[in-house]
């Protein structure tokens, strides 16, 4: 999908209450430059509601942190302030129009180590919460979250897949 057509598609997928029609829906797009990544970041920032948790998936070097930079920049955070939280595990960016919380689960040993960071406070923190390598702590994610899968297709080119995930509640035994 081209960037100009992306806004309404992402708006329909990522905003509001989850419904069953979203279960198999995937919005995909390709970007071919850092400028297009920044444009995509503006679109995504404009459609995500505060309180949204975003799972970022992709190989090393796929552009997960660069994408968070693009979204944070669209929210008014200076791009140079956004760095990978690989060694500190979480970065908080509060200088923009809304808080952005940026986790990196790559080095976490298990779910308990993630839970020690107090993610619920961030999930309910009135901003956006991005989690790189979220597949490593998937059971700790909220019931409803956005998933963005990034694949590197060239030096500055990336393929993005957007999904809305809502896990069913299990009935008590």
Each language-model region and where it sits:
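Hydrophobic anchor at the beta1->P-loop junction of P-loop NTPases
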Residues: 54-56
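P-loop (Walker A) phosphate-binding loop of NTP-binding proteins
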Residues: 59
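Conserved lysine of the Walker
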Residues: 64
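N-terminal pre-Walker A segment at the start of P-loop NTPase domains
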Residues: 22-40
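Short phosphate-coordinating micro-motif centered on Lys-Gly-acidic
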Residues: 2-27, 109-173
């Amino acid at each position: 999908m081209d960037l100009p057509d992306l806004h309404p598609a992402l708006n329909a997928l990522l905003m509001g209450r989850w419904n069953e029609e979203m279960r198999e829906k995937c919005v995909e797009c390709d970007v071919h430059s850092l400028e297009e990544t920044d444009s995509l970041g503006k679109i995504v920032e404009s459609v995500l509601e505060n309180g949204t948790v975003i799972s970022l998936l992709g190989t090393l070097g796929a552009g997960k942190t660069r994408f968070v930079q693009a979204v944070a920049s669209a929210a008014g955070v200076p791009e140079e302030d956004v760095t990978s939280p690989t060694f500190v595990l979480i970065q908080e960016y509060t200088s923009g129009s809304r808080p952005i919380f940026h986790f990196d689960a790559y080095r976490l040993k298990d779910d308990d180590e993630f839970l020690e960071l107090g993610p619920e406070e961030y999930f309910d923190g009135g901003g956006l919460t991005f989690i790189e390598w979220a597949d490593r702590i998937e059971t700790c994610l909220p019931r409803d979250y956005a998933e963005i899968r990034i694949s590197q297709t060239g030096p500055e080119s990336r393929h993005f897949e957007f999904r809305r995930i809502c896990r069913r509640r299990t009935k008590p035994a």
